């Protein structure tokens, strides 16, 4: 990726006020440990990655009161190539339905997560 320091002309002219996507992407996000503990970490009830883990975490962090801040073009990312893994053992529609139900009920603390370990 490209890195533009906040003091650079390119950042000041083009990126500073750019409305970049403010969503959590699993390959490159960070959070405070206490925030992750507060929502009980990743929701292990989904099993394998059926609903994007990052999608589930994003709405749960927001419901808990955390803001999402984009560091696009500011933070470097190195992602190693890998083939996509096909997951046949998961019903994605059922997992999405479960996530939307929990979101509707504002259940941002998952039942099966870090506290079980």
Task: Name what the model sees in each region.
Residues 7-9, 18, 29-33, 71:
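Short, flexible segments with low predicted structural confidence
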Residues 88-115:
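Catalytic core of nucleotide-sugar-dependent glycosyltransferases
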Residues 23-24, 28-40, 47-67:
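A short, conserved alpha-helix in the catalytic core of glycosyltransferases
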Residues 3-6, 36, 59, 91-94, ...:
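A C-terminal cap/extension of S-adenosyl-L-methionine-dependent methyltransferases
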Residues 62-68, 87-88, 104:
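Alpha-helix boundary/capping detector
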Residues 45, 71-88:
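Active-site donor/metal-binding and catalytic loop motifs
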Residues 6, 12, 41, 51-52:
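Alpha-helical architecture
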Residues 1-21:
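Short, flexible, basic/aromatic active-site loop/helix in glycosyltransferases
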């Amino acid at each position: 990726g490209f890195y533009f320091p906040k003091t650079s002309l390119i950042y000041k002219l083009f990126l500073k006020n750019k409305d970049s996507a403010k969503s959590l992407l699993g390959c490159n996000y960070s959070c405070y440990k206490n925030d992750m503990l507060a929502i009980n970490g990743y929701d292990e009830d989904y099993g394998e990655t059926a609903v994007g883990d990052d999608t589930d975490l994003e709405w749960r962090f927001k419901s808990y009161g955390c803001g999402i801040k984009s560091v696009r073009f500011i933070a470097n990312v190195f992602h190693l190539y890998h083939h996509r893994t096909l997951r046949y053992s998961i019903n994605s529609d059922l997992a999405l339905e479960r996530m939307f139900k929990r979101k509707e009920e504002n259940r941002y603390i998952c039942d099966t997560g870090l506290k079980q370990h």
